[in-house]
Amino acid sequence: MKHFLEISQLSSEQIESLLQRALYFKHTKQYPSYSQSIIANLFYENSTRTRISFELAERHLAMSVVNLDLQTSSEIKGEAIEDTIRTLAAMGIQYFVIRHKQDGLQQNLANKLGDTVHIINAGDGTHAHPSQAILDMVTIIEQKKRLDKLKIAILGNIKHSRVANSFQCICSKLGVGDLVLISPEIWQPSQVHFGRVTDNLNEGLEGADVVICLRVQRERLLEDDHLDLDFYRNNFALTQKSLSYAKPDAMVMHPGPMNRGVEIDSEVADGNQSCILQQVTNGVYARMAILESLIAS
């Protein structure tokens, strides 16, 4: 694996290998050392979980880590991102973790620069967030062993969610039994990669084994008069009442950051069924598996 860009570019066998390797790291705490490998983290969008998770993964693997401060870099002077990467590669940096608001940017960089560097997609616009899909599936298979028997519900702004896009792809690759995308009509995707769409919250949650709640992007609500926060809260929030339609042992997940009292209530986020912090923990091990796969190949 030369780059890690999209779930759709991986085989089911590659995905299974990443999942099992992540669990191996978690349970054994036995980590290989890649002290000769140098990696740079370039985050052109704000991030807490993904950025720190990748950095911890890199340090667990004994990689040399460079965190580029974009506020003091030549990007402020107008330098193109491909020139930044070429410059860093000339200094000996081989691996680049990149988050950017532009859809497809990491794929374009891989096409232009792929002979000399390895690109890891840490999120591109509304397009893809493949490492989130891996860590989410690691979290699920820890508790639910038969993916083909599961009903998974993902709730929120599906249309603009890179998390939802990548998760649909990984469910398709691994043969998840039933994936339901729950969203108000205006947030429903124009293209469904896998699963079925509904705007009926209770119907979508009925009998679900896993419920994934997405963040409501308040900045997008303010820009669009058609989106009403109170309407969303009243009809699509994950509350104790709405969660009761899912199975009693249903897992509750959220990629973060959460808007408590908007898309999810605190008693759900902090309740016995919540696996949100488990996702954060597994994110480090999932990203270790991804990085190792790139280095080893």
Swiss-Prot record:
- Pathway note: Pyrimidine metabolism; UMP biosynthesis via de novo pathway; (S)-dihydroorotate from bicarbonate: step 2/3
According to UniProt, the reaction catalysed is: carbamoyl phosphate + L-aspartate = N-carbamoyl-L-aspartate + phosphate + H(+)
Q: Which PROSITE patterns match?
A: CARBAMOYLTRANSFERASE (PS00097)
Q: Does the keyword Transferase apply?
A: yes
Which terms in the GO cellular component ontology are assigned? cytosol
Query: What Gene3D superfamilies does this protein's entry cite?
Result: Aspartate/ornithine carbamoyltransferase
- Please provide the record's keywords in A-Z order: Pyrimidine biosynthesis, Transferase
Please provide an example of a Pfam family that matches this protein in its UniProt record. OTCace_N
Task: Give GO terms: molecular function aspect only.
Answer: amino acid binding; aspartate carbamoyltransferase activity
Under which main EC class is this enzyme filed? transferase
Ligand binding (carbamoyl phosphate): 49-50, 99, 129, 132, 256-257
Q: Which InterPro entries match?
A: Asp/Orn_carbamoyltranf_P-bd, Asp/Orn_carbamoylTrfase, Asp/Orn_carbamoylTrfase_sf, Asp_carbamoyltransf, Asp_carbamoyltransf_Asp/Orn-bd
Q: What is its EC number?
A: 2.1.3.2
Q: What does this protein do?
A: Catalyzes the condensation of carbamoyl phosphate and aspartate to form carbamoyl aspartate and inorganic phosphate, the committed step in the de novo pyrimidine nucleotide biosynthesis pathway.
- Quaternary form? Heterododecamer (2C3:3R2) of six catalytic PyrB chains organized as two trimers (C3), and six regulatory PyrI chains organized as three dimers (R2).
So what family is this one in?
A: Belongs to the aspartate/ornithine carbamoyltransferase superfamily. ATCase family.
The UniProt entry, under HAMAP family, shows: Asp_carb_tr
Protein's name in the database: Aspartate carbamoyltransferase catalytic subunit
Q: Which gene encodes it?
A: pyrB
